[in-house]
A protein has these predicted regions:
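Generic structural signal for residues in well-ordered beta-strands
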Residues: 24, 118-120, 166
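A structural motif
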Residues: 42-44
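Extracytoplasmic/periplasmic beta-strand context in beta-sandwich domains
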Residues: 1, 164-165
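Beta-strand->loop->alpha-helix junctions that form or flank phosphate-binding loops
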Residues: 16-19, 121-123, 167
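Conserved ATP-binding loop and adjacent catalytic segment of the adenylate-forming AMP-binding
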Residues: 1-23, 36-40, 49-51, 65-66
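AMP-binding/adenylate-forming catalytic core of the ANL superfamily
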Residues: 30-33, 46, 51-52, 59, ...
Length: 189
């Protein structure tokens, strides 16, 4: 669906490219099209995009907006049409009505050289609806503490987007593809 152009075309770091043979758009929560560089849900349509779930009209209805397939992925498109994937909709943290991408918090945690793996996730909260926690694994011999990592996040993201708690694990849970499973962290910690 997406591809980086061949030389002399431009490749952009962090982007899987632009749409070829299909269309890609970014949808707001009310399913209208987002402006350039505004994050929303990635939707695709084209001749090789599925039409429906077999014998499952309810799932088909919730997955499609007209002929646009809603992917469940979050992203943004720049002015040149390059897509940047920023996360998964079901992993989005909604704190006090504000959408917070967990990857933003991950990147703040990864900014310390002792952090080997990092993943932010949400927990229910009576005050804000959801609160932020994170899990990290650090290199052997590291003296990093929870307050150290929270301070890094506050410095880079501000207090509102920073985790309340940071869990230290020897290894974060991963799926078959090797991706860290945030939802598993929610269940097990």
């Amino acid at each position: 669906i997406l591809s980086n152009p061949l030389p002399p075309g431009t490749r952009k770091i962090g982007s899987p490219g632009i749409a070829y043979g299909n269309e890609v758009t970014i949808l707001t929560t009310d399913l209208s099209e987002c402006a350039v560089n505004v994050e929303g849900e990635i939707a695709v349509r084209g001749p090789n995009v599925m039409l429906e779930y077999l014998r499952n009209p309810e799932t088909t209805k919730s997955t499609f907006h007209g002929d646009w397939l809603r992917t469940g992925d979050l992203g943004r498109k720049d002015a040149d049409g390059y897509l940047f994937v920023t996360g998964r909709l079901k992993e989005l943290i909604i704190k006090g009505g504000e959408n917070i991408a967990p990857r933003e918090i991950d990147e703040a945690l990864y900014s310390h050289s002792d952090v080997v793996e990092a993943a932010a996730f949400s927990r229910p909260c009576e005050t804000y609806g959801e609160r932020i926690e994170a899990a990290v694994s650090v290199c052997e011999g590291s003296t990093l503490t929870e307050p150290d990592l929270i301070s890094i996040c506050i410095e880079k993201l501000g207090n509102f987007k920073s985790p309340d708690t940071v869990h230290f694990l020897s290894e974060l849970p991963k799926g078959p593809s090797g991706k860290i499973q945030r939802l598993k962290l929610q269940e097990t910690l």
